[in-house]
Amino acid sequence: MSGPTYDRKIPGISTDLSGSMSCHPTSKDSPTLPESSATDMGYYSSHHEYYQSPPYPQQMNSYHQFNLSGMGATPGAYPTKTEYPYNTYRQYGHFNRDLQTPPQSAVKEEPETEVRMVNGKPKKIRKPRTIYSSYQLAALQRRFQKAQYLALPERAELAAQLGLTQTQVKIWFQNRRSKFKKLYKNGEVPLEHSPNASDSMACNSPPSPAVWDNNAHSSQVNRGQIPQPPLSSTPPYMEDYSNHWYQQGSHLQHPVHHPGPPQSVGAVY
């Protein structure tokens, strides 16, 4: 093994090992690797802190101020934010009160507009009177003869037919009733309201029994004629009494209808 061949192999192996070691240097031969890695880590860490660390505290602070604006947050940080909802609420409530108060005052001032000062004295202004046409007056008069009081559907229908409002129809009927009562009380009922004029208001009550009916029946009994029952309908409980009264009248007719022969004075004495 100590021959020339072995000596030649050893330098070849050493050269191969040195070549391989030169291709793959160790950490001791390359001192820049740790420094570069350290600088790279510091560079990236500094940028990471620069881009990430400021936003999080800012967002947390803003979120904290937003949520705790009215719950003991740092005073003076956002004065407009803490007072904005309260001021808005106060302004909104004040605005609502301003909107609600004018209708009340307007309602109170409505009667004052109808009062006018005449010679230093307040005088109420009367509304203009409604002028009815001849057709409307004739239709209202005909309806008044049928009924003095109208129901709501009837009043609405009549107002629609005549082109009037329901208030105008109601006021006309009220005035007409008061006028009729006044004339009837004074005994000055006009001809149009007489019973012969087919006025239902004058004939609303059932006809009273005539006074001469009893006299007529008594005269018929005296003349011996059987009285006939009247054509007017009578209640059922009155029929028995009337039949009994008629039968009594028929018994009374014999002594009246067949009187005895007159006796002369000479025959008696």
From Swiss-Prot:
MF annotations from Gene Ontology: DNA-binding transcription factor activity, RNA polymerase II-specific; RNA polymerase II cis-regulatory region sequence-specific DNA binding; sequence-specific DNA binding
Main subcellular location: nucleus
Xref: SMART domains: HOX
Entry keywords, A to Z: Developmental protein, DNA-binding, Homeobox, Nucleus
Pfam family, one: DLL_N
Sequence ranges of Polar residues compositional bias: 15-39, 195-205, 215-225
Compartments in which it is found: Nucleus
A Gene Ontology BP annotation from the UniProt entry: otolith development
Basic and acidic residues: compositionally biased ranges: 1-10
DNA-binding region coordinates: 125-184
Residue ranges of the region described as Disordered: 1-41, 191-242, 250-269
Entry comment describing in which tissues the protein is expressed: Expressed in the developing forebrain and fins.
Family matches, as InterPro entries: Distal-less_Homeobox_TF, Distal-less_N, HD, HD_metazoa, Homeobox_CS, Homeodomain-like_sf, HTH_motif
A cellular component term, taken from the record's GO annotations: nucleus
Function in brief: Involved in the development of the inner ear.
Family: Belongs to the distal-less homeobox family.
PANTHER family: HOMEOBOX PROTEIN, HOMEOBOX PROTEIN DLX-3
Name of the protein described by the UniProt record: Homeobox protein Dlx3b
Origin species: Danio rerio
